Amino acid sequence: MSTLDTTSATTHRRSALLAPVGVLAVVAGVIGWMLPDRTVGTGAMDGMSMTHYMGLLAVNQPWNLILFMAIPVILAETLAITELVLLFRSDPPTWVRSLSRWAGLIAGPVMVLVLVHLLKNAVVPLTSGGGWRGAADVIAVLTYLLAGLPLIGITLVEVGAIGTDARDARKWHAIFVGVFLVLAHVAMIFG
């Protein structure tokens, strides 16, 4: 089942997921808020001048790299690759649809956790304390955070909150994948 299915049973199942995925997103947000500050620590790069984006990935190894880079990128790349199969094959394998669906359902809550945690522990303190290290630093961090919004959008497509029909849902799914890839690459370039 994916956004390509048009049966009323599929629409009902998609809508039925809205509440559980919403609860999962709220729980992820609470966890992101309550986690100890993962933006500070020691790492092999101590003393080097770098953006906060790269600094975040360098401290608390390997956990920050896994939480803030590996998990979101694996989910997004899975979505991108399965999206190509779904768009270009007239009858894609069921496992591709299922993989895309599960990655789409998980991506939103993961990014809610990441966004809440980084807004609380990085963006607000850096902004209020004047801690930004120049324009590249701001661009890297903010585009990374903005890249989370399309992944949340994909989850909303998967639960039926966005997309009036299968074609519209497919369109939004593809748009969100593309927007994520652009924003994530801008973050990496400036990071």
Language-model region placement:
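Low-complexity, intrinsically disordered extramembrane tails and loops of integral membrane proteins
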Residues: 1-8
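N-terminal membrane topogenic signal
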Residues: 8-22
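Hydrophobic cores of alpha-helical transmembrane segments in multi-pass integral membrane proteins
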Residues: 19-37, 41-49, 53, 61-87, ...
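Amphipathic, cytosolic membrane-interfacial segments at TM-TM junctions
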Residues: 90-99, 166-168
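Membrane-interfacial hairpin junctions
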Residues: 126-130
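Membrane-interfacial catalytic/cofactor-binding modules of polytopic membrane enzymes
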Residues: 131-139
